[in-house]
């Protein structure tokens, strides 16, 4: 293989059509995938390298010096750092631009999340992952237009924190065995939730809850 062909192959980036993933649930865990959707450091684009550098600088200069204080359940410090991450665009990397995000790919989002971990704060990374993943993605993928416009811009900026309520006392984390119900109000304007949820990451601080 010639050098030019090698370089071309290394610099190739692959895009994932997330529309095709809707409705598949956890099928991605057991369905074989081709090498085309696997990324390596050698395939990072210039934009991805830029985000990697910015995230590393934030991790080293902002998160690391206060990491031990964050681990001591310091709400104000955690929320302040969380909002700084939003201002830098780290919370809305793969959220569509029309809803306040950057509209980039999941690979870039993963790179940023990975590099921010160098800051040494496990709890902050869990807070971020729950917010950008299981709290934001359900609205992005399955929310109606009103919900997307109302919540996603503020979740991308860090103004709102999100959480995902799954686990129940009697069902554990088995979503199909959950007993919580949503009943439409008599006037048809809102839903009334009846049930119990426990062990909700970000649950004490979040303003947006997906369940």
What are these regions (language model features)?
Residues 158-166:
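A short, Trp-centered hydrophobic/proline-enriched beta-strand micro-motif
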Residues 98, 167-171, 198-199:
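Short, solvent-exposed loop/turn elements at beta->coil junctions and helix N-caps
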Residues 104-105, 174-176, 202-207:
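Short glycine/proline-enriched turns and hinge-like loops at secondary-structure junctions
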Residues 189-211:
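A short core secondary-structure module
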Residues 137-139, 165, 208-211:
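Adenylate-forming
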Residues 1-129, 147-150, 154-157:
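Amphipathic, small/basic residue-rich leader segments at the start of a protein or domain
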Residues 84, 174-194:
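Cytochrome P450 C-terminal beta-domain/meander region
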Residues 124-146, 172-175, 184:
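N-terminal glycine-rich flavin-associated loop
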């Amino acid at each position: 293989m010639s050098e030019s062909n090698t370089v071309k192959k290394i610099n190739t980036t692959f895009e994932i059509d997330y529309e095709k993933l809707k409705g598949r649930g956890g099928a991605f865990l057991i369905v074989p995938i081709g090498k085309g959707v696997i990324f390596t450091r050698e395939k990072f684009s210039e934009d991805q390298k830029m985000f990697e550098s910015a995230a590393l600088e934030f991790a080293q200069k902002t998160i690391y010096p206060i990491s031990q204080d964050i681990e001591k359940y310091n709400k104000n410090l955690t929320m302040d750092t969380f909002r700084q991450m939003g201002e830098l665009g780290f919370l809305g990397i793969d959220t569509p631009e029309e809803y306040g995000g950057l509209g980039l790919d999941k690979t870039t989002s993963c790179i940023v999340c990975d590099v921010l971990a160098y800051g040494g704060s496990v709890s902050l990374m869990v807070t971020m992952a729950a917010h950008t993943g299981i709290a934001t993605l359900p609205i992005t993928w399955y929310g109606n237009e009103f919900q997307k416009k109302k919540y996603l811009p503020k979740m991308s900026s860090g103004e709102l924190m999100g959480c995902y309520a799954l686990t129940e006392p009697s069902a554990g984390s088995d979503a199909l065995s959950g007993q919580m119900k949503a009943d439409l109000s008599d006037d048809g304007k809102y839903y009334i939730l009846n049930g119990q949820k426990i062990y909700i990451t970000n649950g004490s601080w979040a303003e947006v809850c997906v369940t």
